[in-house]
Amino acid sequence: MKKTPLLNIALSRVIASLGHGDILMIVDAGMPVPAGVELIDLALTRGVPDFVSVLDVVLSEMQVESHVLSNEMAEVKPPALQVIESLNLDDQLGQQRWISHEDLKVLSRKAKAIIRTGECQPYSNVALVSGVVF
């Protein structure tokens, strides 16, 4: 059995396969997933699992170079935003970029995979850009 926090087989496989610059998205329950992009659907019910729990586990395994958020997230300020801001202070998410929610949907077409959570707070979505550990 793995010793690290991440137990989900599909998610572990995707993170292990990421190369420099690949995009992995963590999204709320309402974010559409484009055809052809791998979906790792973790959603069980409203709020389970929540965005922050999934982000924490993903960050335990993934080197992040930068991340992309929607402008709407800054306006609505879901609880996930405070956590992301805290992670930024610790330099765990690299450079931050803001785009419109519609542009985030367009960017999702380039994602290697999208992780759907049970999060129901609007605009709780992030695109993580993979970095390297060397």
Swiss-Prot record:
Q: Which Gene3D superfamilies match?
A: RbsD-like domain
Q: Say what the protein does.
A: Catalyzes the interconversion of beta-pyran and beta-furan forms of D-ribose.
Describe the family membership recorded for this protein in Swiss-Prot or TrEMBL: Belongs to the RbsD / FucU family. RbsD subfamily.
In its UniProt entry, the species of origin is given as Pseudomonas savastanoi pv. phaseolicola (strain 1448A / Race 6) (Pseudomonas syringae pv. phaseolicola (strain 1448A / Race 6))
Which positions in this protein are listed as binding substrate?
A: D28, H101, Y123, S124, N125
**What's the catalysed reaction?**
beta-D-ribopyranose = beta-D-ribofuranose
Q: Where is the active site?
A: H20 (proton donor)
HAMAP family from the entry? D_rib_pyranase (MF_01661)
Instruction: Respond yes or no to whether keyword Cytoplasm is given for this record.
Output: yes
Q: How does it assemble?
A: Homodecamer.
User: What gene does the UniProt entry assign to this protein?
Assistant: rbsD
Q: What is this protein called?
A: D-ribose pyranase
What does the entry give for GO biological process?
Answer: D-ribose catabolic process
Extract the InterPro entries matched here.
Answer: D-ribose_pyranase, RbsD-like_sf, RbsD_FucU
Q: What is its EC number?
A: 5.4.99.62
**Which is one Gene Ontology cellular component term of this protein?**
cytosol
Q: Where in the cell is it found?
A: Cytoplasm
- Metabolic or biological pathway: Carbohydrate metabolism; D-ribose degradation; D-ribose 5-phosphate from beta-D-ribopyranose: step 1/2
Q: What is its main location?
A: cytoplasm
